[in-house]
């Protein structure tokens, strides 16, 4: 297996290689076709393709000259807006290479910039608008000031669907000569919830421990409980077999080394999938949230887990 990070090794390099995101690809293809585009803001959760799509757009716009015409910056890495200003100024003062009418600046983690820095960024975008376009990347649109939002076309990136993530993981596993079970693929998706970067990294971590990846291999590699085992344990608790459930959970923590907060997070996911009336689910979520908060505050995690399971069983009995 290659030592290169698989997420980088298998990063798409064209629109056709990008899984899902059909609406986004359609809009960006129109910009490429017209040879012009506005400033853009890509926003959405981590691992949903924002950086990848920005780089694909650069390749599609500039072809072999995409590196010469593209400047990548990270707002959290740079030493301040003055550094960004100087780098953009130096980059924008020369003409684009090839036939492109403008150069491209990709600014990641733009929502981590202060309001003052974003105001300065807005002025930079206006000064160099004649021959430079900006793509701002952000996890949270609420972190971007309104004066910038009004000057860009905003494109939302949603968590990737399970089918798209699992298909990509299976493709990578085949290319790397790794055997992986369907249950293992499902477990990786459960752990990563539509974050493609996190999913591919999880696959690589699991593959580094075993050539044949099962659900249990994934769980051990990622420091989580096998979803199958957790569901079985939850069912024991809901049936009133607390002694058995407590023994199993104790084993997950002490013998398996799984963190109590991780177990609480997994219980939260499983509980909300129970076949119960919808009006009950907010109360279930609240019970789990209380246990999570108390554990974060220093309470003993196992005690919080056992207490939450008892409350959940009592609530579900009342709802029947």
From Swiss-Prot:
Q: Got a GO cellular component term for this one?
A: DNA replication factor C complex
Q: What GO biological process terms are annotated to this protein in UniProt? A: DNA repair; DNA-templated DNA replication
A Gene Ontology molecular function term for this protein is:
ATP binding
Which SMART domains does the record cross-reference, listed alphabetically? AAA
What the entry lists under Pfam families is as follows: AAA (PF00004), AAA_lid_RFC1 (PF25361), Rep_fac_C (PF08542)
Q: Which domain of life is it from?
A: Archaea
Which positions bind ATP? 44-51
Keywords on record: ATP-binding, DNA replication, Nucleotide-binding
Spell out the subunit comment. Heteromultimer composed of small subunits (RfcS) and large subunits (RfcL).
Checking HAMAP family in the record gives:
RfcS
Q: Which family does it belong to?
A: Belongs to the activator 1 small subunits family. RfcS subfamily.
Q: What does this protein do?
A: Part of the RFC clamp loader complex which loads the PCNA sliding clamp onto DNA.
Q: What is this protein called?
A: Replication factor C small subunit 2
Q: What is the lineage of its organism?
A: Archaea, Thermoproteota, Thermoprotei, Thermoproteales, Thermoproteaceae
